């Protein structure tokens, strides 16, 4: 039983300052997951359940509320919904993460695509705050191929997409970025942050997209989806890889994170082109 001893008010909501914390029954968590999908379209059941439960209950502890009270907060105030979406999705990234793999794209894979394509179509799936698609765009500029390239960048989280479109980053996002790229493609702001130049931004199109629910575009030459799929349940992972394969042109490439492997890649019509880079052969 929860005892209400005193309350504090934040915005329109009252929070119990002496909330008696308890472990919530599993059925309350499952109810919450279903309500979130029904009301907001976020399918949490395809994520690893312990990760979702842990992150949600950290927010419940923060506000000293239960699942039902918290759902009411999400419905009535977009600020809490944005915070929840940010906690549930994966938004930790940097420019040129695992740089040796990006140099393989620059030196071999993108030139190979360009040789065989009049127009190049790339997709950064689960793009977070934009570091990944902008990394791609920088490589395209370095190869003087921006005139024939379109980069689609998608994420489920509207908040991070807004940050991506703004294109302003803290210095810590550039730990793997060559100095010449930083000087050539970014403008340093008075507060020490960096803003991506418009010449890079203009070939990237940002769009909200739910990998688990929304239809996929077709005929991509390259799909980059790194450190996103690891958070999904095995069934959802397999379905995503199948849909990525269907979205690629024959000969197209799928670039995944350095902790991700597609064990049934042959069944999906892939070959291992390089470690963590798969090529569609069917």
UniProtKB/Swiss-Prot annotation:
<feature type="domain" description="CheR-type methyltransferase">
    <location>
        <begin position="17"/>
        <end position="282"/>
    </location>
</feature>
<feature type="binding site">
    <location>
        <position position="93"/>
    </location>
    <ligand>
        <name>S-adenosyl-L-methionine</name>
    </ligand>
</feature>
<dbReference type="GO" id="GO:0032259">
    <property type="term" value="P:methylation"/>
</dbReference>
<dbReference type="Pfam" id="PF01739">
    <property type="entry name" value="CheR"/>
</dbReference>
<feature type="binding site">
    <location>
        <position position="91"/>
    </location>
    <ligand>
        <name>S-adenosyl-L-methionine</name>
    </ligand>
</feature>
<feature type="binding site">
    <location>
        <position position="132"/>
    </location>
    <ligand>
        <name>S-adenosyl-L-methionine</name>
    </ligand>
</feature>
<dbReference type="InterPro" id="IPR000780">
    <property type="entry name" value="CheR_MeTrfase"/>
</dbReference>
<dbReference type="InterPro" id="IPR036804">
    <property type="entry name" value="CheR_N_sf"/>
</dbReference>
<keyword id="KW-0489">Methyltransferase</keyword>
<feature type="binding site">
    <location>
        <begin position="226"/>
        <end position="227"/>
    </location>
    <ligand>
        <name>S-adenosyl-L-methionine</name>
    </ligand>
</feature>
<dbReference type="InterPro" id="IPR022641">
    <property type="entry name" value="CheR_N"/>
</dbReference>
<keyword id="KW-0808">Transferase</keyword>
<dbReference type="GO" id="GO:0008276">
    <property type="term" value="F:protein methyltransferase activity"/>
</dbReference>
<dbReference type="InterPro" id="IPR022642">
    <property type="entry name" value="CheR_C"/>
</dbReference>
<comment type="function">
    <text>Methylation of the membrane-bound methyl-accepting chemotaxis proteins (MCP) to form gamma-glutamyl methyl ester residues in MCP.</text>
</comment>
<feature type="binding site">
    <location>
        <begin position="210"/>
        <end position="211"/>
    </location>
    <ligand>
        <name>S-adenosyl-L-methionine</name>
    </ligand>
</feature>
<dbReference type="GO" id="GO:0008983">
    <property type="term" value="F:protein-glutamate O-methyltransferase activity"/>
</dbReference>
<feature type="binding site">
    <location>
        <position position="97"/>
    </location>
    <ligand>
        <name>S-adenosyl-L-methionine</name>
    </ligand>
</feature>
<keyword id="KW-0949">S-adenosyl-L-methionine</keyword>
<dbReference type="GO" id="GO:0006935">
    <property type="term" value="P:chemotaxis"/>
</dbReference>
<dbReference type="InterPro" id="IPR029063">
    <property type="entry name" value="SAM-dependent_MTases_sf"/>
</dbReference>
<protein>
    <recommendedName>
        <fullName>Chemotaxis protein methyltransferase</fullName>
        <ecNumber>2.1.1.80</ecNumber>
    </recommendedName>
</protein>
<dbReference type="Pfam" id="PF03705">
    <property type="entry name" value="CheR_N"/>
</dbReference>
<keyword id="KW-0145">Chemotaxis</keyword>
<feature type="binding site">
    <location>
        <position position="155"/>
    </location>
    <ligand>
        <name>S-adenosyl-L-methionine</name>
    </ligand>
</feature>
<dbReference type="InterPro" id="IPR050903">
    <property type="entry name" value="Bact_Chemotaxis_MeTrfase"/>
</dbReference>
């Amino acid at each position: 039983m929860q005892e209400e001893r005193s309350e504090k008010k934040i915005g329109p909501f009252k929070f119990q300052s002496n909330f008696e914390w308890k472990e919530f029954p599993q059925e309350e968590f499952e109810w919450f997951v279903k309500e979130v999908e029904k009301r907001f379209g976020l399918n949490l059941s395809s994520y690893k359940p312990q990760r979702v439960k842990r992150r949600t209950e950290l927010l419940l502890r923060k506000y000293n509320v239960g699942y039902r009270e918290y759902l009411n907060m999400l419905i009535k105030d977009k600020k809490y919904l944005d915070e929840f979406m940010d906690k549930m999705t994966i938004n930790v990234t940097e420019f040129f993460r695992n740089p040796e793999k990006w140099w393989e794209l620059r030196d071999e894979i993108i030139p190979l695509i360009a040789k065989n394509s009049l127009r190049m179509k790339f997709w950064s799936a689960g793009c977070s705050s934009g570091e990944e698609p902008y990394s791609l765009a920088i490589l395209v500029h370095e190869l003087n191929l921006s005139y024939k390239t379109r980069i689609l960048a998608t994420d489920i989280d509207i908040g991070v997409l807004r940050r991506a479109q703004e294109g302003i980053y803290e210095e810590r996002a550039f730990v793997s970025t060559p100095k010449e790229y930083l000087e050539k493609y970014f403008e340093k702001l008075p507060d020490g942050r960096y803003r991506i130049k418009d010449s890079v931004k203009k070939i990237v199109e940002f769009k909200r997209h739910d990998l688990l629910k929304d239809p996929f575009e077709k005929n991509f030459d390259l799909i980059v989806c790194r450190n996103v799929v690891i958070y999904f349940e095995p069934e959802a992972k397999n379905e995503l890889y199948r849909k990525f394969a269907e979205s690629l042109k024959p000969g197209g490439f799928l670039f995944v994170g350095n902790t991700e492997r597609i064990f049934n890649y042959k069944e999906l019509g892939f070959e291992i082109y390089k470690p963590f880079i798969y090529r569609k052969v069917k």
